[in-house]
Amino acid sequence: MKSTVEKLSPTRVRINVEVPFTELEPDIDRAFKQLAKQIRLPGFRPGKAPRKLLEARVGRGAVLEQVVNDALPARYSEAVTAESLQPIGQPEIEVTKLEDNEELVFTAEVDVRPDIDLPDLGALKITVDPISVTDEDVDAEIEALQKRFGTLTGVDRAAEDGDFVSIDLSATVDGKDVPEANTEGLSHEVGSGQLIEGLDEAIIGLKADESKVFTTTLVAGEHAGQEAEVTVTVKSIKVRELPEVDDDFAQLASEFDTVEELRADLKEKISRFKRVQQAEAIRDKAIEVLLEQTEIPVPEAVVQAQVDDTLHNAIHGLDHDEDKFAESLKEQGSSREEFDADNRANAEKAIKTQLLMDSIADKLEIQVGQNDLTERLVLMSRQYGLEPQQLLQMLQQNNQLPAMFADVRRGLTVAAVVHGATVTDTDGAEIDTAEFFGPSGEQAEAEQDEAAPAEDATEETDADSDEAADDSK
């Protein structure tokens, strides 16, 4: 088999393949065996009919068509391997020549990973905001705990901002009742702004069993976007009483005995949360800087496929109704034009990022270990509420393991990029990235060197123990 490659663009090639008929003999034999099992000829047992009789029955052309269909995928893969190509997406294959007993010639056009001129990774500089945990941060968490363990007590007065009320609602549009907007005994925190616009203002000043009518725009249902007359009736008013922040409260709200211990724990949790946010900012900034410094051609067909997939997922829940989709976007303050523009921009950025990370991974020779895959599998199984083995079977059935492998490799690549970069905060302080990106190569080697003497000492101790045991026998 011979193959050549024509570069159509930085991201697309045409592979020309010539296959001598002698190399197709195994495929021809296989085709006749399949036909022999499918076709019954008088005087012959199933699967035992001679080639000539089978060929006479179905025709030589049908046999060759079956041979070509069976042979193309393997010959295409062989050509891709021989030419060291890295396809992304499915090929467009065309048979250009098929001469019996001579040769099969076909072409395959396919998008491929482009050659990317990478910047100097060692010169990469990443700057993010510094981390600080203030007393106000801790106070906010304490207040949240107070609210969680607070009690609601009824009051005999008009509703105020921050009160908790039970309300009945009804609405009309153009004088006609809107059944889906009617509700009774709805709990609501005054001032939260969680329901319809104008509700909080209407409630404030009302006492129990008092009502008020106000005008608002409905945001959901059949009458979404229409102006409605809404009647709100207050049924009860309660105020939240917060517990005093003392050691008893600490014991009620946590596993700690004192407020001091509780505050220290909250401070550490806030610090870790902010460190996680900072690590995410470092990752995003590293990718952002690399994308700015690198020219990355993207295959249009791959971009369009992702654009179509995102659109399909967005509109699928609306029964693919374009009008409903447009109305949904309007409710969110957007439009179809904005959605399409954002969708394409996001698709292009995502594909550029993948191509960039894959190229860097190749350059740095990033290897994915079994532990890396296991950690990702366990993490994903927790997110989906499945057993790891159950999730693994689902990924295998849906052929998603290669995608998971690629994603893990890209994550390891980002970590390697961060290790090689200079990472500081805006105050100029260098940031230790080991907590979330793992130790650098030098740090890992140093840790192994430190662990080695301890392991040797353990082995010597075990040997001494064995000798002592032998002596005692």
From Swiss-Prot:
Residues 444-473 have a biased composition (Acidic residues). GO terms for biological process: 'de novo' cotranslational protein folding; cell division; chaperone-mediated protein folding; protein transport; protein unfolding. The keyword Iron does not apply. PROSITE patterns: FKBP_PPIASE. It catalyses: [protein]-peptidylproline (omega=180) = [protein]-peptidylproline (omega=0). Residues 433-473 are annotated as: Disordered. Coiled coil: none annotated. This is Trigger factor. It comes from Mycolicibacterium vanbaalenii (strain DSM 7251 / JCM 13017 / BCRC 16820 / KCTC 9966 / NRRL B-24157 / PYR-1). The gene is tig.
